[in-house]
Amino acid sequence: MPKVLSPAQVDAFKRDGFVAPIRAISEQRALYYRHKLEAFESRYPNDRIKLDQKAHMICPWIDEMIREPGVLDATEDLIGPDILCWGTSLRAKQADGKTFAGWHQDTAYAEVKPIVVIVALALSPARTENGCIRGIPGSHRGPLLPHKEAFATNSLLSREQFIDADFDQGAAVDFALDTGEIALFNNAIIHSSNANFGNDRRIIFLLEMVPTHAYQHEPRESAVLVRGTDAYGNFDLDPQPKTEMGTAELAAWQRAVEIQSSVLFRGAQRPARALHGMTSGQAPSGA
């Protein structure tokens, strides 16, 4: 039997590619993480960009977040008890009606198979007026559509990508969340988010979860084991951070992000280094 999700919700995820909203942590616990984030932003005003990719490697409190029982129980209901967290990303929007994310499929750039479940954890209200994530039900079972990159926009997306093809946008469903709730969605689903016209920042962390049997052919990437055991060894294991923004933590983070970016930014028209705050060496190949 599922731990958190009902059998109907598990079936809905398979059919529609998402399930939401699910209560994962209390509002008080979410505010704890929000305060940690805001303290980080105050201490490191020029380094928030580092939270856009594999943030669990540089902040102990994010490593704590990805291990929340409510998050992992819901994830286990979808991909089983042996779970790796492959990536963590901050997606925050000011309440200024500007920042958005165009329609896209993460499988346009991510190459991990057979499935990546993205857990969107809300640390503030993420309702329709706040620019919540939106998705096209069932589109994860369809083809990968062609994407283009945009420039000089207010897109949240690292490559400012958008789908350059026709599809039924009228079928979109809002993944509206209250503070402490999660949406779980297949990374192949067509999804986007509008600008935030609410009264508060929209703060979401995206936690990219994969079963331990997941794989990527080349290059070999890293992930962190958050539940169960890893009998496959398809990923190197990320070290858990002991100190926020510590020297060892930043060095490990940079190595891991350079490898991941060599895939995610393959063929990109801007270097991944500039987008993710890396500091030295050459830009990842193809980026």
Language model feature labels by segment:
Residues 11, 128-194:
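Double-stranded beta-helix
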Residues 100-108, 187-193, 207:
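Histidine-centered catalytic micro-motifs
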Residues 189-287:
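Non-heme Fe(II)/2-oxoglutarate
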